[in-house]
UniProtKB/Swiss-Prot annotation:
An example molecular function term from Gene Ontology annotations: undecaprenyldiphospho-muramoylpentapeptide beta-N-acetylglucosaminyltransferase activity
Name of the featured protein: UDP-N-acetylglucosamine--N-acetylmuramyl-(pentapeptide) pyrophosphoryl-undecaprenol N-acetylglucosamine transferase
Family: Belongs to the glycosyltransferase 28 family. MurG subfamily.
Gene, per the UniProt record: murG
Top-level taxonomy: Bacteria, Pseudomonadati, Pseudomonadota, Betaproteobacteria, Nitrosomonadales
Top EC class of this enzyme: transferase
One GO CC annotation: plasma membrane
NCBIfam families the record matches: murG
Disulfide bridges in this chain: none
A biological process from GO: regulation of cell shape
Length: 357
């Protein structure tokens, strides 16, 4: 059983593990929440899902905290019934709301429990479950403090097509002409990127101006198209990108937020990046994520408070493709492309080598 929900940063790595395990003959059942993206996304990928009622609390009203014991008890009871019915041989918590009650009940029912932490600063669910889990898997060293014999650094599971891209040397070496930039705001878009990018491009002489693919998020596409038009610049403007591997392969530079899965994809693909962490992320974990690349000259960490159109335009005009190739090579050196298979193997080892999860 895989438990994950709430955001793509939990769900997509879980799906990568699920595909790896399914390919080895495992039966996969997912535990998610009714209101999370996993409720629709997991069945679309061909996996069965069981749903409980539970959600996050950070930033909510006092009444939500007062109701927490009741809501957690209800979610634990729902998880208990699902676990009794499904009888998984091993339970993998990938973080997010459903993993807390599911993980607690898995341990009480004597099911082997593994957890996987995607960020450099662990989320609340995994901080709690780390105290009772049989195995702790980490994307980044030091995210959770736990006994060495229980802990293993695996990296973040990413899509196979990204992990199998050609090397940066093969991709960058023969490119000429203006830079190709990929701007990724995530599924909901990043408004600061939608505002700053067209303005910065307008400050670059037309013969030096990069080619841009800009993913805006569905709700912001019309406004982004207007912003590009207002500044007299052009780009390939899209609401959502389905084939990220192809875009990683074709671009010289990615400008994006610093979610854990994004960091792992950039490393696996071997792409240079400017990382602008979301400043209101819980525990500022995106800044910590970004440093995993920037500390090794694999990316530029650019705080949102310091980002201006003029400074970005100047940076883009002075950087060279050779510098970007060097960043991309450093990024690829940090990759752990077999993470999905490594997590799957850890589940199998803990389960006693059966084919039901």
């Amino acid at each position: 059983m895989i438990m994950a929900g709430g955001t793509g940063g939990h769900v997509f790595p879980g799906l990568a593990v699920a595909r790896s395990m399914q390919a080895n003959g495992w039966r996969i059942v997912w535990l998610g929440t009714r209101n999370g993206m996993e409720a629709a996304l997991v069945p679309q990928h061909g996996f069965s899902i069981e749903l409980i009622n539970f959600s996050g609390l950070r930033g909510k009203k006092l009444s939500s905290y007062l109701l927490l014991p009741w809501r957690l008890a209800q979610a634990c009871w729902q998880s208990f019934r699902i676990l009794r019915r499904q009888q998984p041989q091993v339970v993998l918590g990938m973080g997010g709301y459903p993993a807390l009650p599911g993980g607690i009940m898995a341990v009480l029912l004597g099911k082997p429990l593994l957890i996987h932490e995607q960020n450099r600063i662990a989320g609340l669910t995994n901080k709690i479950l780390a105290k009772i889990a049989d195995r702790i898997l980490l994307a980044f060293p030091g995210a959770l403090t736990s006994p060495e014999n229980k802990t293993r650094v695996t990296g973040n599971p990413v899509r196979t097509e990204i992990a199998r891209l050609p090397s940066p040397e093969a991709r960058y070496a023969h490119r000429t002409g203006n830079l190709h930039i990929l701007v990724v705001g995530g599924s909901l878009g990043a408004q600061v990127l939608n505002t700053v990018l067209p303005q910065a491009l307008s400050m670059i002489p037309e013969d030096q101006r990069p080619y841009v693919t800009h993913q805006s998020g569905k709700a912001h596409l019309d406004a982004l198209q207007q912003a590009y038009a207002d500044h007299g610049v052009t780009g390939n403007l899209v609401a959502f990108i389905e084939n990220m591997a192809a875009h990683y392969q074709d671009c010289d530079l990615v400008i994006c937020r610093a979610g854990a899965l994004t960091i792992s994809e950039l490393a696996a693909a071997g792409v240079a990046s400017i990382l602008i962490p979301y400043p209101y992320a819980v525990d500022d974990h995106q800044t910590a994520n970004a440093r995993f690349l920037s500390d090794y000259q694999a990316a530029v960490l650019w705080p949102q408070s310091e980002l201006t159109a003029a400074s970005l335009a100047q940076w883009l005009m002075t950087c060279s493709r050779a510098q970007l190739q060097s960043m991309a090579t450093h990024a690829r050196a940090l990759a752990m492309p077999e993470a999905a298979q490594t997590v799957a193997e850890a589940c199998q080892q803990l389960s006693g080598q059966t084919n039901e999860a």
